[in-house]
A protein has these predicted regions:
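Conserved cofactor-binding/catalytic machinery of classical short-chain dehydrogenase/reductase
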Residues: 161
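EAL-family c-di-GMP phosphodiesterase catalytic domain
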Residues: 150-151
Length: 179
């Protein structure tokens, strides 16, 4: 994923080092030298956010994996984001949560995690982006920008939509999907 930041700040200032422009998402399966490889990537200083996205793991497994990832993220000054689960954000004391359109409502998520970061998927829709901005999402994500080899691409976004959205918001923008 690639992080775009418009000049200025979003609804609540989200400090983003301009040298750190990557929003990295975990693989579907954690195995082998994952933690060692993650540390090697994060130590480069190019990653702003790391999202733990583990759809097929139990809560107990996610907590165990999340504790290890959080430690690596903290050491490398990378924001640790949890996909879809504000309650897990609280359990792990992660930096925030990423919500898809079918996940929990941002208002409810804010009640659960307070002032932590909440980002919202907007697919390829300016209307969804406007709703997320109005709800005070700390960043908005568009995609997929490329087709996947592993799953069907439902929404295809383009640079054109990012340019349109940048004209009316200072909220940071993330390009996701197949990158």
């Amino acid at each position: 994923c690639v992080l775009w930041q418009h000049k200025g700040n979003g609804p609540k200032k989200l400090k983003i080092d301009k040298k750190k422009f990557i929003y990295l998402i975990s693989p579907n399966k954690i195995s082998g030298k994952f933690y060692q490889n993650l540390d090697k990537i994060l130590v480069t200083g190019k990653v702003s956010f790391f999202q733990m996205r583990l759809k097929k793991y139990t809560l107990k497994q996610k907590i165990s994996i999340g504790k290890k990832i959080k430690k690596i993220c903290k050491k490398n000054k990378v924001k640790f984001i949890i996909n879809d689960d504000p309650l897990l954000v609280s359990k792990l004391d992660a930096d925030g949560c990423h919500l898809g359109q079918k996940d929990m409502n941002i208002t409810i998520a804010k009640k659960l995690i307070g002032k932590k970061i909440i980002g919202i998927t907007c697919h390829n829709s300016i209307d969804l982006a406007k709703k997320a901005i109005k709800a005070k999402a700390r960043y908005i994500a568009f995609g997929s920008f490329f087709t996947y080899k592993t799953k069907k691409t439902k929404y295809l976004a383009s640079i054109k939509i990012l340019n349109k959205v940048k004209k009316f918001t200072k909220t940071p923008i993330v390009a996701i999907g197949g990158i």
